């Protein structure tokens, strides 16, 4: 697809301006930031995760509005492209999933994730947490799949550590999938997250979840 490029873009960073004249995607970016603005993220009493979901559900995907952020890399399963930091309260990312690729099974570093499909479809596998007593005793504790869901263009999903672990994959062997993710607080970017082995249940921590691009500019 023409808006997926494995190269450095010459686009200028987004500079906040008056909402008037912005397209629907960048209006969504502003609205998400406004909802999170007075708080420290979705854990705060004055923010309802449903408000985030409703805002994302109200946006109809238009690739001309977000394509500048959709940078891909064929050497990776997917790329994490930063769009906005929500006044330091969150990370809003466009993820580009290569055909047939998937994420590892992972947690969310005690943060909340709201995800919208911008293009294509993604498959989510959810898992129970492994039994910590077995892990501490050096025993294998294979992860149990609790739910499988196909998410299609414009659908929205919510995930947090309270719901378990998950893995996201692009089931299409020929086409990219693209999704918009809001993480709040932005713990994974600052402190990393844990990846899990499906057969043993054992985990290892990665120190930081890095970005492939920042506001349309490849890093």
Swiss-Prot record:
EC id: 1.13.11.20
GO molecular function (one): cysteine dioxygenase activity
Nucleus listed as a keyword: no
Catalyzed reaction equations: L-cysteine + O2 = 3-sulfino-L-alanine + H(+)
UniProtKB keywords: Dioxygenase, Iron, Metal-binding, Oxidoreductase, Thioether bond, Virulence
Post-translational modification: The thioether cross-link between Cys-113 and Tyr-183 plays a structural role through stabilizing the Fe(2+) ion, and prevents the production of highly damaging free hydroxyl radicals by holding the oxygen radical via hydroxyl hydrogen.
Family classification: Belongs to the cysteine dioxygenase family.
UniProt protein name: Cysteine dioxygenase
Organism name: Arthroderma benhamiae
